[in-house]
């Protein structure tokens, strides 16, 4: 079998002209024997892109409870102190129920939120500063609100009674949530567009010709300030930032954890659409639970030492999402994570969280078999990676990791090469 795999690996990946300048790493592992059936540069480090989310999902399944911890609610004599836990689902449009918001509404005492458990930055190390306006790079913080995004909408309709031949259309532009921040209008164009200033919550709206259009734009979080401003408008009352005196007074007082969404529901969304925000905040939630502070560098070291001590090649793990080009993992590292995941979690749960061919970010992958692959892709400029579980023609599930770095082809071409190789197994 190894010789046959080697032959097809050379045909579709290693010696293919489209990948002539690329670095390719391949690992195929049989979990039933715990042996590799094929390796090619499997011990080399590669930029994994969103394959990092496999590691984050593993850590979340191992360390987060069944329902996500949203905040610690500590009731004092004259106030309520809230300790945020990094939950990305609070008031996120993905979810209909928000237990913490209901608590806020019913509270009769003044509400205060502590901000002394945040020990990292809004933008991750190695993230592209040019992408500040893109919805896939929302800022991280201790208490996300609305996914730290403003959803903008444009609706156009035909006027019933136009005043001039040119004035035939009504255009309505609005946001969710509504904001009181600065807004200006730019030059109209074919496509609706919203551009935020890089260092300010100032949004420039350009009307498009579409009948309906939408765009999500990250807002600057300013720690807790921006989110609490939006929350005040939605809640109808303020949640203030706690001072040191109140924090000290609360010491020794017990609080209760307010839970939010089902963990696996969030992880499925994270894996299906490769949601960077959910991934990075999941890592910060783990950090808050285990270290009592949100610090991705510290929790990464803790996880490598504790849960991922069997990794054969020490990775350079930087964030939860894979947005950072500083991340480096080997294919053999990914195999260990996949193997541990399958050993520790129910197979049905893995199949629910991981997309299969034709679903999510694997929707372009196709195969006649009902089950062929459950995996996570990852791509950046010059990078395509795919790791997960593949069903061979002989009906055996194998762990696999394929990492392609520094290619000069388009992603679609590389993806098809990887797909052809996997279908040959």
Positions of PLM-derived features:
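Short Pro/Gly-enriched beta-strand edge/turn motifs at strand-loop
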Residues: 8-11, 175-178, 367-374
